[in-house]
Design a protein with these regions (language model features):
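Low-complexity, Gly/Ser/Thr/Pro-rich intrinsically disordered linker/tail segments
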Residues: 190-224
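N-terminal capping segments
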Residues: 30-147
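A generic structured-segment signal
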Residues: 22-23, 41
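N-terminal Sec-pathway targeting helices
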Residues: 2-21, 28-30
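...with weaker cross-activation on analogous glycine-rich loops/strands in unrelated enzymes
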Residues: 62, 123-201
């Protein structure tokens, strides 16, 4: 191969590399902060009765369980972008959010102001929380605090994913460093999907993740 041919091959290789790099960057740009709101199909062929709460905290004619589920879906339908920020208002108001905001907005619009409730609980039971200085604007948006709060204010349920009938749309599921709302749709094995917000690279807000996680530490229902 002469000098001219080597130069031509080098140019071709560089061009191919540039095209490949542009393609990768394009895919990344299309994925970053572009989480889909499209709901996965309910694939379970069996019959699992839905649970309905006897409580309607906000008096809107919709029971708590249904309210929490509907509100979680309504929140992610606004397509919040993932970013951890501090807000003087507590609740994000700029189109950004994290995993705890899915739960906070789902409960808020069902009659449960998590910001006020968690702050009151921290001040009443400071020994239960590892917090040096309480801050109502952020404490309710931390998973570690919600673990403590729900452990004694909500209805505790099984963490065994195989007990599929015990997992109902509108339930809360807590992982070691993450939290979400259980969906009313299920995979082929009857395991429900989870409505959550975990990353700016997340492909969809509602995903089949329960069986894949090994760090489930809590499963709760807001009311009976």
């Amino acid at each position: 191969m002469n000098k001219s041919e080597r130069k031509r091959m080098l140019c071709v290789s560089l061009a191919a590399g540039a095209i490949l790099l542009c393609g990768v960057l394009l895919v990344l740009l299309m994925r970053y902060q572009h989480t889909s709101t499209v709901r996965p199909q309910d694939q379970y062929a069996g019959q699992i009765p839905d649970f309905y709460s006897t409580v309607d905290a906000d008096g809107d004619g919709v029971d708590d369980q249904t309210d929490v589920l509907d509100n979680a879906l309504a929140y992610v339908d606004t397509r919040p972008k993932y970013k951890s920020r501090y807000y003087q208002t507590g609740y994000p108001d700029d189109g950004y959010g994290v995993c705890t905001d899915v739960v906070a907005f789902a409960l808020k619009n069902a009659g449960y102001d998590l910001q006020a409730l968690v702050d009151a609980d921290i001040r009443e039971h400071p020994q239960w929380y590892d917090i040096r200085q309480p801050d109502a604007n952020i404490d309710f948006r931390r998973v570690r605090n919600l673990k403590v709060f729900f452990s004694h204010t909500a209805v505790a349920l099984t963490t065994e994913v195989s007990e599929t009938e015990e997992w109902q749309g509108g339930d809360l599921v807590i992982f070691e460093k993450h939290i979400g709302i259980v969906s009313d749709r299920r995979n082929r094995d009857g395991v429900p999907y989870v409505i959550h917000h975990n990353s700016p690279w997340q492909s969809a807000y509602e995903q089949d993740i329960l069986e894949k996680r090994t760090d489930i530490v809590g499963h709760y229902r807001i009311s009976e």
